[in-house]
Design a protein with these regions (language model features):
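TRNA-recognition modules of translation machinery and tRNA-sensing kinases, especially anticodon-binding
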Residues: 1-452
Length: 452
């Protein structure tokens, strides 16, 4: 196959059969976030490289090994965003959102780019859902974004997840911790990878996040930050746990979580899958970054957030056999015999679409038999065929493709009558799901599809 007709390694095409599932997932995430008071923000796909070097941290794997960076025609160093927080923080500063009522709660779904080894649920171009809360130091905010993530997983029906939390302190208590880490890793200088030798001098905490098997094994015996927390950070962490207890959100304290980005302080957390097919996969995570806005040139603004990769989330959904709505079905296919009937079919479809109904008619000049085969491939829920006799009578028979029932509708009032019937059919199906005790996200989507 020619190079230019094949997607670049680490990227993927989302074809029509799958794109509707993606759209359902995206809409679900934004809808749940809006219930928590988050409003959508959109930022550029590329930023000045310095934003990520300063914000994400120049000793992180992301900045050192994974960013797509280039010089533009003006000689400026530009980077495709590897994550969403830095851009959202830059926008918060640039547009003076700190002058608005705080906290500012934003959310986004955005494409991100990292040069890493492609594997299941992980791509070089991926899509990230994230939320950011700017302007509050309160532990209640930490618990709220964790509860938002938990609500998403619960709504989607994802099971076998463990919420793991930790506190990685603040600059005050980290100073002593860094000394302890450095003393520990100095014993293994001859075994550390080259990158971690550099980190040993500049930021020893980053060694804890190294993917090298040797470095990871050494890091297992390293001191943990929980033993070095200052009184303020310890109190903050205890209050976060109290809120989680009050919200009845189960968690385990994992002292080894540090996250892969330098801006994190105090609370960090991850939702980890323990399903047989996705064991150990992090489905989402985040934490507090009280110093990020200040690092980017603003005033001290305690903030926090979390993110989850959509491709990874979809892989977990698939592994657990969770049904999401698939390709949107055609509500009705209107077949026709002859030119006059084709004009009527076109007009009826136009009226139906204006009323929010998914309707199609023949635009290829097919025979009636071929039209019905096409309707079957579209999985049309209802079909009808209009001929000269139907036009003369002023009504047409519509067939329910699920149960075979036929109902006569007036051509003159077709859109109103059919739309009402569609709503009733959706409501009946929804009631059946409730009675059967088998209600899921797909059923809810189908109901609202019928009510649109």
């Amino acid at each position: 196959m020619a190079l230019f007709t094949k997607a670049v390694k680490g990227t993927q095409d989302v074809l029509p059969a799958a794109s509707y599932k993606n759209r359902f997932l995206e809409n679900t995430l934004l809808d749940i976030a809006s219930r928590f008071g988050f409003k959508e923000i959109r930022t550029p796909v590329f930023e000045h490289t310095e934003l990520f070097a300063r914000g994400v941290g120049d000793t992180t794997d992301v900045v050192q090994k994974e960013m797509y960076t280039f010089l533009d025609k003006g000689g400026r160093s530009i980077t495709l965003r590897p994550e969403g927080t830095a851009g959202a923080a830059r926008a918060f500063l640039e547009h003076g959102l700190f002058n608005e009522p705080l906290p500012q709660k934003t959310c986004y779904i955005t494409s991100c780019y990292r040069y890493e080894k492609p594997q299941s649920g992980r791509y070089r171009e991926f899509h990230q859902f994230g939320v950011e809360v700017f302007g509050t130091p309160a532990p209640a905010a930490d618990a709220e974004i964790i509860s938002l993530a938990a609500e998403i997983f619960a709504f989607l029906g994802i099971e076998d997840l463990t919420l793991e939390i930790n506190s990685i302190g603040c600059p005050t208590c980290r100073a002593e911790y860094h000394k302890a880490l450095k003393a520990y890793f100095e014993q293994y200088k001859d075994e550390l990878c080259g990158t971690c030798l550099d980190r040993l001098e500049r930021n020893p905490m980053r060694i804890l996040d190294c993917k090298s098997p040797v470095c990871s094994k050494i890091a297992e015996g390293a001191p943990v930050m929980l033993d070095y927390l200052c009184d303020e950070c310890r109190e903050h962490f205890e209050k976060v746990k109290s809120y989680l207890d009050a919200l009845m959100i189960d968690y385990v304290v994992n002292p080894h979580i540090v996250r892969g980005l330098d801006y994190y302080t105090k609370t960090v957390f991850e939702f980890v899958s323990h399903n047989d097919k996705t064991d150990g996969l992090v489905c989402g995570g985040g934490g507090r970054y009280d110093g990020l806005i200040e690092e980017l040139g603003g005033q001290h603004t305690p903030s926090l957030g979390f993110a989850m990769g959509l491709e990874r989330l979809l892989s977990v959904i698939e592994a657990q056999g969770i049904e999401l709505p698939g390709d949107q079905k055609c509500d009705i296919y209107i077949g026709s015999i002859g030119d006059a009937a084709s004009l009527v079919a076109a007009k009826l479809c136009t009226d139906l679409r204006s009323d929010g109904v998914s309707a199609q008619f023949d635009v290829a000049g097919r025979s009636v038999k071929a039209q019905m085969k096409y309707a079957d491939k579209l999985c049309a829920r209802f079909t009808c065929v209009i001929g000269d006799d139907d036009i003369a009578k002023g009504e047409v028979l519509v067939k329910n493709m699920e149960n075979g029932e036929k109902t006569a509708f007036s051509i003159e009032n077709f859109s109103d009558e059919f739309s009402s019937a569609l709503v009733q059919a959706a409501a009946n199906a929804f009631a059946d799901s409730i009675n059967d005790g088998d209600l899921n996200a797909a059923d809810i989507s189908n109901l609202f599809g019928g009510l649109r």
